Swiss-Prot record:
UniProt-listed Enzyme Commission number(s): 5.2.1.8
Matching InterPro entries: CRIP, Cyclophilin-like_dom_sf, Cyclophilin-type_PPIase_dom, Nucleotide-bd_a/b_plait_sf, RBD_domain_sf, RRM_dom
Organism (species): Mycosarcoma maydis
PANTHER family membership: PEPTIDYL-PROLYL CIS-TRANS ISOMERASE-LIKE 4
Its biological purpose: PPIases accelerate the folding of proteins. It catalyzes the cis-trans isomerization of proline imidic peptide bonds in oligopeptides.
Protein name (database record): Peptidyl-prolyl cis-trans isomerase-like 4
Biased composition regions of type Basic residues, renumbered to the chain: 455-464
Gene3D superfamilies listed in its UniProt record: 3.30.70.330, Cyclophilin-like
Gene (UniProt): CYP6
Length: 551
């Protein structure tokens, strides 16, 4: 008791309530078997309300039941275009998104007023039906006849959501046609009415349907645009989408962020060129707020590129045009505008945290913790407070699209360095404690030995004869030297064992990190292989279903 509707926006599978609404389900199933709904358009789509179709004329005024289309010789034929659907007595309601109902109208019986009071009224329906696009539409109960529920296509981002977000005109009709391309009856438990004959093939579009065509779902709206403009539009759309994604994940303060226009990037410098020299050369173009040649943190060697921040945008532009390919310290330098927004992001994070510390990576790169700069664009350009300190910009991404991958790479490298630093600090502390404890123990032992030696010397001076005093003194000194040599050997052996243990722990931690890295790499490869296999399988299934529908 299921029907598959293949629409231009995706597939919809409907389960029918054959026990609660047998007459409505019979009408719907036989119309589907007759391909009555093929190429019907959703002529009425109201956001978060309903999507209506089932009228071959696509006007909302046509459509007929299956019994009115039977031959006149049939026992089940009816002269009326409409039929009376069942009343479910409150068992079927419009409570969930995806409820399928026949669009009904009231027929007033004699003695009833316009509101249906003072007499009796009955609901009549033809072929038009609608699908609800929201939960809890209980005010439709008693006015229309539910007979099914969407079981596939109602998930978030599915076909119903695509229909719900379609652009419509003033008459609530989608600007781009949403049509039922094909109908497949998966299961039909009802017998065919007398005189019913299903067509042998899918019928061709009627002239009425052709005249009602608007903008086809596969028609290119930019067909009159030249390829260059179309490519530019595509690139702009991709750039805006990527920037919006970075803003949502927190990598950018806002999607429209732009690099500062008063900062120049200078590269191909001589390793001997210093920040003061570069500032002196560029200062003839205007006031310089900061000039820094980026250096390696460990060795202190120049990385041969620098950032120069001018007070005004015009000064930076003049320096850009005048200093391009100029010889500085026997090197032809290259000047360009800075494309980095990392400092802007760090300042934004600091403001968002309402005075709390900015991310550690931001301060490690040289940013000032006491000042907050404003780089949002306004009529006068980017503004900045007087701060001459610039942070380290090496390995910064030059393209906006690489910001997310660069941040993830920097985070992994930073965590690796911090783990090594913590291990090194712990080992240094242990070695310092060991070296500090050993002299203290030696001093305490030497003090005890000195007191014991003085006591023995005093005892010998009192009880030993003068002739034996020299021999006893030599014997005591030899014993003291022997104990001192033994203590020295013990100290050396303990220090060697401590160093050996520390080297063994460092080697074990390095092997653990290598093993974890290899395991993560194998897991990523396996996940990528599974994803590709699943994509290939879905593509093959889609191709087979498309070939089957063509046949």
């Amino acid at each position: 008791m299921s029907v598959l509707l293949e629409t231009s926006l995706g597939d919809i599978v409907i389960d029918l309530h054959t026990e609660l609404a047998p007459r409505s389900c019979t009408n719907f199933l036989k119309l589907c078997s007759k391909h009555y709904y093929k190429l019907n358009a959703f002529f009425r789509v109201e956001k978060d309300f309903l999507a209506q179709t089932g009228d071959p004329s696509n006007t909302g005024k046509g459509g007929a039941s299956i019994w009115s289309q039977l031959p006149s010789t049939s026992q089940d034929s009816s002269t009326s275009t409409y039929f009376t659907p069942e009343s479910s007595d409150g068992q079927l309601k419009h409570l969930k998104k995806g409820t399928v109902s026949f669009a009904c109208f009231r027929k007033h019986v004699q003695g009833a007023d316009e509101d249906g009071e003072g007499g009796s009224c009955e609901l009549l329906a033809g072929s038009q039906f609608f699908v609800t696009l929201k939960d809890e539409l209980d005010y439709l109960d008693g006015r229309h006849a539910p007979f099914g529920m969407v079981v596939e296509g109602h998930e978030p981002g599915g076909t119903l959501d695509k229909i719900n977000h379609a652009f419509t005109d003033d008459q609530k009709r989608p600007l781009r046609d949403i049509r039922i391309r094909h109908v497949v009856v998966l299961e039909d438990p009802f017998a065919d009415p007398d005189g019913f004959c299903a067509p042998s093939r899918s019928p061709s579009p009627t002239p009425c349907q052709v005249r009602a065509l608007r903008l086809a779902d596969d028609e290119d709206v930019h067909s009159d645009v030249d390829p260059a403009s179309k490519e530019e539009m595509r690139r702009n759309a991709d750039t805006n989408a990527a920037a919006l994604t970075l803003e949502m994940v927190g990598d950018l303060p806002f999607a429209e962020i732009r690099p500062p226009e008063n900062i120049l990037f200078v590269c191909k410098l001589n390793p001997v060129t210093r920040s003061d020299d570069l500032e002196l050369i560029f200062s003839r173009f205007g006031k310089i707020l900061s000039c820094e040649v980026i250096k390696d943190k460990k060795t202190g060697d120049s990385l041969q590129y620098a950032f120069i921040e001018f007070d005004k945008k015009d000064d930076a532009e003049r320096a850009y045009f005048k200093m391009q390919n100029v010889l500085v310290d026997d090197r032809r330098i290259w000047v360009d505008f800075s494309q980095s927004v990392s400092r802007l992001h760090g300042d934004w994070v600091k403001k968002r945290n309402a005075g709390s510390d900015a991310p550690r990576a931001h301060y490690q790169s040289g940013a000032d913790e006491q000042s907050v700069d404003s780089y949002r664009p306004n009529a006068g350009g980017y503004q900045k407070r007087g701060d001459d300190r610039r942070h380290d910009r090496r390995d910064q991404p030059t393209a906006r699209g690489d910001t997310s991958s660069w941040h993830s790479r920097q985070d992994s490298e930073r965590s690796y360095r911090e783990s090594n630093d913590d291990t090194r600090d712990r080992s240094n502390k242990r070695s310092r404690r060991h070296h500090d404890d050993v002299p203290q123990q030696s001093r305490s032992r030497s003090e005890r030995h000195d007191s014991h030696r003085d006591h023995e010397r005093h005892h010998l001076s009192r009880h030993v004869r003068p002739s034996d005093e020299g021999e006893s003194k030599c014997r005591y000194e030899a014993h003291s030297h022997t104990r001192h040599d033994e203590h020295t050997r013990r100290h050396d052996s303990s220090s060697t064992a401590a160093r050996r243990d520390e080297d063994r722990r460092s080697e074990r931690s390095r092997h653990d990190r290598d093993r974890d890295r290899d395991r993560d790499r194998d897991r990523d490869r396996e996940r990528e292989h599974r994803r590709r296999t699943e994509d290939r399988r879905r593509h093959d299934d889609r191709q087979r279903s498309r070939d089957g529908s063509r046949r």
